[in-house]
Amino acid sequence: MKKLPFLIIIIYIFLILISISSSIDYNYNNDIDNNNNNIINRNKNKNKNNLYNNKVIIKNDDNDDEINNKFKIRLDDNEDQDIYNEYHFLSKVHNRLAFNIFGSSSENSGSGSNSNSNSKNTDSSTGPTPSPISINGTLNSTATVYWSGGKSSCKSVNCTEEGFSTGDSYACSYEITPTYQRGQWEKGVKYFKDPLPKSILTSQVVGVSFVINGVVGCTPLKQELTTIEFLIQDVQVGQTISTNRSDDCSCGICYKDYEILPQSYDLLGYNKSGLNKVQLLLLDNSICATSLDIIFYYHPSTIPPTPTPTPSKPTISLLKKYLIIGFSIVGGLLIIGGCFLLIRNRYRSSGYYKPDKNDYTQIKDGKDIDIHQIKIGVRIGKGNYGEVYLGTWRGSQVAVKKLPAHNINENILKEFHREINLMKNLRHPNVIQFLGSCLIPPDICICTEYMPRGSLYSILHDQALQLQWSLLIKMMIDAAKGVIYLHNSTPVILHRDLKSHNLLVDENWKVKVADFGLSTIEQQGATMTACGTPCWTSPEVLRSQRYTEKADVYSFGIILWECATRQDPYFGIPPFQVIFAVGREGMRPPVPQNGPPKYIQLLIDCLNENPSHRPTMEQCLERLESIDSSGYSDLQYVRQQL
């Protein structure tokens, strides 16, 4: 053991000598190889840019045999000359044609005809069509927004028979009757996060294209064209789009793709770090849509080619010498430090570790916090991981959470310290305020602000309280703001244990998110109580899939259900059965019978099986703020029976 550090140092010096001897030839040969590769890549890119970027795919439903069809296409580039190119196509089983050569999109069937078999308007004119921009040599990133709420009037088999695709949900820009609602169109406005890579500048973006997954021309009594404009951040993208296509709109979940060619876009007012507003604005006629794809085209970052170097005698520069010396010194220090840590860790593991004053965590004003400075009062909470006490520190009431001695070990201390460093940097009115901590065993604790009304769970289950809908919605708005702050932090903080027990309420009924930093630690060595965390956990996480922001949205939906019913989710069902029923069989709590319709619909959307179809927390906040709760009676607590 004592000879191990010296052996590591000898090996390190040997590797440094080898690297110095080989650096000359390697750098010289590598420079020549890199230059040759640059020349080859430039030639490849040059040839690639010469390719014409138009593609035509025709598939025919009328015949399953391979029929040789002729189709003539006149390209816009040859409009001054009567030049036609003849193409041959093999027909197959599908009838979808994405036809973009003339700057418009149409759906075609048969063996090459460009007329629309579903169109009720025989006029082939589509009005002025914006000229496409060149996207040669670009990459693209896509953001997708979804519409929902439309009443389904057909099954997926109808979509297959008619050659459509089947969507999960939809909304229309019009209604048939007030009782036959066509979803939450909301003037075609949706919000999306920037899909571009963080390294891409707005100046590298050349344009945007769109794909409407839906049906167009939905007002059969109107004979005019369907006229559409696309706006991002209230700025129109490209020109007005017109089409005479008319689809069968009776079945909203059945859709086709309506593709819009790339349009120029200068990203005026575009938000690279947050949400952006997109609007599908109908000027004439109407549509039904399941989703909208927003495709950004951008030039990748390029490195200018370097001139071919003239082979010269391989030499090593003075700068390289200094770099090698510097790296050697730094590497040596790292090895010495590593050896020290190795010896200290072995010393600690043998039972001789004694923490010192440096284990205190500094609070925000730069002063140490000592557990002996806090006057511990009555116990106000208890969990599997420890106990929470009401304390008095510097004349103010605080909450002190203590870890039990039997849970304390070196790994717990490291995780505890990491989470404290995260918590002390968070400042938001709807996030519990961290005051300080102590890491000296056995007094391992954190100190936070005291919330006199306790948890939201205790309020919902207080028989003496009658809660108004306006108050419940206000508290949910507070909770949404707190979670949004965590999701937008750097790095992103995923709560992972969002439930009514972890939403604390102050004397003014303001809700603050708590226990987002310690949930992983607190579960170690703990046994879940009846109806524990699985009741708030999303189905994909119960299936051991990746935890994302949408998992927190699902947990938020369960809390919305708790507020609407003042009951425990899955009451009386053991946790292991909840895991199977929710994760594998799609079980959900029953839909509440009383409450504002917008609130109930938001609750349902948050519990969607598909994470991508759940709203974001920003959308949850926006929808909560728009709810009118007037006219709904107060919610009373009703004891649940097994």
Curated annotation (Swiss-Prot):
Glycosylation sites: 136, 140, 158, 244, 271
Pfam family, one: PK_Tyr_Ser-Thr
GO biological process terms on file: cell surface receptor signaling pathway via STAT; signal transduction
Top class in the EC scheme: transferase
Localisation per UniProt entry: Membrane
Residue ranges, Cytoplasmic side: 344-642
Region (Disordered): 106-136
Chain sites annotated for binding ATP: 380-388, 401
Extracellular topological intervals: 24-322
CDD domains linked to this entry: STKc_MAP3K-like (cd13999)
EC number assigned by the record: 2.7.11.1
Signal peptide per UniProt: 1-23
UniProt biased composition (Low complexity): 106-128
Keywords: ATP-binding, Glycoprotein, Kinase, Membrane, Nucleotide-binding, Serine/threonine-protein kinase, Signal, Transferase, Transmembrane, Transmembrane helix
Catalytic activity: L-seryl-[protein] + ATP = O-phospho-L-seryl-[protein] + ADP + H(+); L-threonyl-[protein] + ATP = O-phospho-L-threonyl-[protein] + ADP + H(+)
Residues passing through the membrane, by range: 323-343
One GO CC annotation: cytoplasm
Residue span, Protein kinase domain: 374-627
Domain of life the protein comes from: Eukaryota
SUPFAM superfamilies on file: Protein kinase-like (PK-like)
Molecular function GO labels: ATP binding; protein kinase activity; protein serine kinase activity; protein serine/threonine kinase activity; protein tyrosine kinase activity; STAT family protein binding
Residue numbers annotated as active site: 497 (proton acceptor)
Membrane topology: Single-pass type I membrane protein
Record family assignment: Belongs to the protein kinase superfamily. TKL Ser/Thr protein kinase family.
Protein name as catalogued: Probable serine/threonine-protein kinase drkA
Lineage: Eukaryota, Amoebozoa, Evosea, Eumycetozoa, Dictyostelia
Name of the gene encoding the protein in the UniProt record: drkA
